[in-house]
């Protein structure tokens, strides 16, 4: 190992110490407390208007779930059984508005047609859980108004509309109860479907293309929008890569840990290492690296049997050093993620809600190969909050399972109002 590399990584901000992790944890705690108190904060703590219970809501009828969160639209039926949630009739199609602009009517009608197709197979469906992962204002009746689009969806007339009501209005089979949920809020609710010990504390966590946390505050589930936190120091590589992006300055924490950005950050770190004389960087300037490519290289790709663009851009003698540098990108993401989660674990415990279950979703968290991401995050959380019992669980299709849980929660609230 080149003894100069650890010194370089420390100096440039890619070798966080325990003190650094504690500082990030404290920053998230302060920002969360400020947001809840209505003070200025980089976190938003958006109220989902869904009441929280640590007991899984029960429904014997199937629920239709819609996942509108990216390129693909997915619709299915979900049943809760003794063995856990069971999916049927899962169908994928293109998300309306991703192949060109569409009107509001065309947008809602396309989704209604998919729901009608599943409903024809499940006529006893109790309602619709609508996982709608765009900026919305949640409403007390379970619906939500779209505030802004992202992810290259073009349906401008939908902005300002109640997306649940517009969907239901177009159902051929008549109205159904609907609850509209952010994907991270839905992931938290999915944790209620887990068998095993009861966990009064529940956290929803996503680390994939982006990152976010959902938690419980004042009896309701909140969407923290924690990727927007701006209270931790960034390295020169973070700043340099951010300057190349169309949304420079937005979501600074997210850009330090998540899959949409780690490839670019790693590229900047390798170029900085070349400027420091640690590797020959003559082949790096024209290179563009995705996070998947960076991870493949860090995990060992790039030998004769497995060619790789980064390995091809480096002199063979520099490949081991470059792998050590790439590994640091993912190890820093581990430490930042652990501190991120530890802040919400501590806050849950201090409110009397422990043990804490973290339901984690996202490919960056579960599929990174360069390091044992999940194992290292667990270890570092335990070091930061040694007195709080917690678990991290993976649930297949967590946002869709959580959307179904949201329907059951809404149904329970309606029953309570009728009997009050």
Q: What is each residue range found by the language model?
A:
Residues 1-90, 94, 98-126, 193-194, ...:
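ATP-binding/phosphotransfer module of carbohydrate and carboxylate kinases, centering on a glycine-rich
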Residues 58, 66-74, 133, 184-185, ...:
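A short acidic Gly-Thr/Ser loop motif
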Residues 58-60, 123-124, 174-175, 183, ...:
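Short, well-ordered loop/turn elements at secondary-structure boundaries
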Residues 61-67, 127-129, 177-179, 202-206, ...:
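Short glycine-aspartate micro-motif
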Residues 68, 154-159, 177-186, 204-207, ...:
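Active-site nucleophile and cofactor-binding loops and adjacent substrate-binding regions
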Residues 73, 135-139, 212-214, 231, ...:
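Short, acidic Gly/Pro/Ser/Thr-rich loop/turn segments
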Residues 85-87, 150-160, 186-265, 271:
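Glycine-rich phosphate-binding loop of actin/hexokinase-like ATP-binding domains
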Residues 92-112, 131, 136-196, 201-203, ...:
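Glycine-rich phosphate-binding loop and adjoining helix at the ATP-binding site
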